[in-house]
Design a protein with these regions (language model features):
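Sec-dependent N-terminal signal peptides
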Residues: 3-14
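Short S/T/G/P-rich N-terminal loop/turn motif that feeds into the first structured element of a domain
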Residues: 18-231
Length: 231
């Protein structure tokens, strides 16, 4: 965990640019018997005054539904503007931070890390606890974003958040370049996220048109994560 965090913290300031929000993700495995300890370590550290920059949100997620190529149990994710994330990195160099990393290292095994940014978002802002993540390789971001915008600006349900984003650092050998993140409030919606189109012929036709106009796209994998905490 310590090596993952330090490595991406060093690279991140060269990557971020001022659009929507930026994120860094650190994936690791925790034994079930140690999860309560790890959750408390994260909550105690980022919940304490002075350990989190203004405008930064910190999330702990459980990796709930995934294929065997995503062999980790949890993710620690930071989001914010370029200025907020930059300020967070400036904080993370003192003795308290080093002690936090040392403690985390006792209970976690590193898996991977990545950094990226959102490009376009639609729907209800907020911290939706259930999130479906679709990793893709997109050949033409401009073309895909145009089709994404045309559909979601009109048909995306108001009770969720749908985001098109880009992976900038830490791409896997599978070659994902982008992702779509769908945040919802319950598992029923997560497991039937397209059901709102079933009795809406216009939405069905628009969905078909959307995917006919995205350019070349390959789905790399899909997964579902569950929010355990936010600070």
């Amino acid at each position: 965990m310590k090596n993952l965090l330090l490595g991406v913290f060093t690279l991140c300031t060269t990557f971020l640019s001022a659009q929507e929000y930026h994120w860094t993700a650190y994936n690791f495995t925790v034994a079930p018997e140690d999860l309560e300890i790890v959750g408390k370590l994260v909550g105690d550290y980022f919940g304490a005054e002075g350990n989190k920059a203004a405008g930064v949100s910190v999330f702990l997620f459980e990796n709930h539904f995934s294929d065997n190529g995503m062999n980790f149990s949890h993710s620690l994710i930071f989001t914010g503007t370029i200025d907020a994330v930059g300020a967070q990195y400036a904080l993370d160099s003192g003795a308290k931070w080093q002690l936090f990393l040392t403690k985390m290292n006792r209970y976690t095994n590193d898996y991977s890390s990545a950094a990226g940014k959102s490009v376009i978002s639609y729907g209800k802002p907020g911290s939706h606890p259930i999130q479906n993540l679709y990793s893709m390789r997109i050949e033409d971001q401009t073309k895909f974003a145009k089709a994404f915008t045309k559909y979601h600006s009109k048909y995306s349900p108001s009770d969720r958040r749908v985001t098109l984003g880009r992976v900038g650092l830490g791409r896997s050998p599978d070659g994902e370049t982008h992702y779509i993140l769908v945040g919802v409030d319950d598992f029923k919606t997560a497991m039937s996220s397209g059901s709102y189109r079933e009795n809406n012929k216009a939405a069905m036709a628009a969905w078909k048109e959307y995917w006919e106009n995205t350019g070349e796209v390959k789905l790399i994998r899909s997964s579902t994560r569950v929010m355990l905490g936010k600070w």
